[in-house]
Amino acid sequence: MAAAAGLLAAGGADAATTRAVADAAGVQAPTIYRLFGDKQGLLEAVAEQTLADYVDSKARRLPEADPVTDLRAGCDAHVAFGLANPAISALINAPQGRASRAAQAGVSVLRERVRRVAQTGRLRVSEERAVDLLHAMGTGTVLALLQKPAGERDGLAETAREAVFAAILDEQSPAVPSGMAGMASALRAGLDDLAVLTPGERHLLSELLHRIANASDR
């Protein structure tokens, strides 16, 4: 896999032929077929491992004291990873019908960062809506930037990020939730710590608050 990763980074998927990978790894081509099925299986395994390593580094990074600053840094890191690994980005963003385990883990990290923001009362939409918008922005931004020459990319990622932040956050009043959606999202984010309610009551209240947050967003 290390040999395939090196060829991918150097020349993209076209450079990582089965023969080239076998030569670089010092093995026979049948070994690759036995382990990964075919070239596509090998490339998908490389992409999964590369993404998993990146997600693991994100999960282990100490969060910023301010949740919004932390969320902004996470968005920037995602775009930077995508631009630094264009071949991997193309593989992990290809339509497959189901996200890989590493991709799901990445969304879980994003979900935790959004939860921290919601707990401060600065989220003006539901957590689910915020996660979906941020995920779409990150993926779309990377794919759009990869289609542009490096010299024409300035500012696009920041503009896209701030447009989504403006739609999901109220950064001017960190101590007071913004409207009904903000209050519902803030309360829902803290339900796990509300020991006075039974699990069933917390689940019901979570569903009601989710509906309020989404209705207020429309």
Regions found by a protein language model. Give the residues of each.
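Hydrophobic alpha-helical connector segments
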Residues: 45, 56-90, 94-99, 105-109, ...
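C-terminal peripheral helix-coil segments that are non-catalytic and often amphipathic
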Residues: 112-115, 147-218
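Amphipathic alpha-helical interface segments
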Residues: 3, 7, 81, 137-144
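Amphipathic alpha-helical packing segments from all-alpha helical-bundle domains
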Residues: 96-146, 150-166
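Short coil/turn segments at alpha/beta junctions that flank glycine-rich nucleotide-binding fingerprints
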Residues: 10-14, 85, 120
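Helix-turn-helix
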Residues: 7, 11-41, 45
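Short hydrophobic clusters on alpha-helical segments that form packing/core surfaces
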Residues: 3-8, 16, 50, 54, ...
